[in-house]
Amino acid sequence: MKYIKQNIKDGVTLHLIINENFKTDFSVVFISIPLEKEDITKNALIPAVIKNGSKKYNNYQLINEEIEMLYGASFDCGLDKTGDNLVLKFYVESINDNFLPEKNENLEQVLNLLLEIVFNPLVENESFKNQYVELEKKNLELLINSVKDDKDIYSYEKCINIMYKNSGYGLSKYGNIEDLKTINSKNLYSRYKEIISKGKIDIIVSGNYEKEKIQRQIEENQFIKNLNSREDILNINNFKTELKEKIDNPETVKEEMDVTQGKLVIGLDILPNNLEDFRFIAIMYNAIFGNGVNSKLFQIVREKESLAYTAKSEYVVQKNNIFIRCGIECEKYDKTVELIKVLLEQMKNGEFTEEDINKTKEYIISGIDSINEEQDTQILYLFGQELSKLPLKTEEYKEKIKAVTKEQITEFAQSIQLNTIYFLKSGGENADNWE
């Protein structure tokens, strides 16, 4: 794999990933902006609205026909919340020219279509087409309501909302239903223009192609030429910037809903410590504690004590948090919470073996190796490094993991504190709303 990063202009970056291992090309436009309550719902609507039509292809059927002409390429868009930033993403997967009956510059046509959709939307009188806006407002309302139907996602997001009620990370990436009443085709287009002029834009092209040809195409594309330079407005979230404060008592929130299985989410803070680069120690700690079938959560909470149907933990490097997530019988709440506290103390006491460490390293390194096996995973990894301002090659990543010691993990465990315990239990029908 060869990776080239090129600044087209301030705030607009081209990333070329040249790899001969895949039969497809993957082309992505990421637009990143800070998470802010005022515009969160408008932001969520924009990808859905602009995929309905551009000036050249003024409805979704025409876009779809063009995509089909490109040997069955696939186009989609979406949203990601990364730390205190929101990422609007637009991507096309297409067959590489080398695997077509005859070479016809398929990738170049794909890129032209992608840039047309993102940067040249269908506009009427300085407004998006009203029909598309109203359609997508209804779809977004359904999507927001559907989050409550998936209790795993709902409980996890609710815990984050409680912990980060006063910051962008606590916002739902889909916004809220109340905002939809005030959104119209004109103010939504105004917000789109603001995002295009201020957001961080990253164009990533992965596949087997001629570097110079793609560079030239992007540089000479009129939509890209029309983009202005912009200042960096993103929030920088990484293990260095997210400094947690010590708290005396964790917050406990219990919510009742019509559920058959309780959902327990525990948010942990990573306090400042003397370890120089504890990301990799945190990854090891999290894996030993709760990420994988050999972890303490899985082996003890789920298998040995039969307290949980599901039990896992996740390290969120952007926010210096670890989240424990369990699906349990509601009457087993107290036992489960107490056992989890015991396991956290065991980690502080170094009650894990060198065999645990070695198995965990193998597990993590296997995951790192898989990053370069899928184009989308590789793209997301590289883009994550871009946002965090902490570039890290996968080989260096593996070496850092190999170097972690038991003493470091035990020392790191001292910096873990309980922040929030959230429990969704049976007993009610309606969930509380949050923004």
Indicate where each model-derived feature is located.
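Short, polar/flexible loop-turn hinges at active-site or ligand-entry regions and domain interfaces
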Residues: 53-56, 98-101, 120-129
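Soluble acyl-CoA-dependent acyltransferase catalytic core bearing the H(X)4D motif
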Residues: 145-155
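His/Glu-rich zincin catalytic helix
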Residues: 1-71, 176, 189-300, 420-435
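Short, low-order "capping/linker" segments at domain edges
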Residues: 142-146, 247-261, 366-376
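Active-site glycine-rich loop that binds ribose-phosphate moieties when present
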Residues: 182-189
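M16 family metallopeptidases and their MPP-like homologs
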Residues: 17, 23-36, 41, 60-116, ...
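Acidic/histidine-enriched alpha-helical segments
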Residues: 64, 120-144, 231-245, 342, ...
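Short, flexible, solvent-exposed loop/turn segments with mixed acidic/basic and small polar residues
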Residues: 80-82, 189-196, 313-316, 410-414
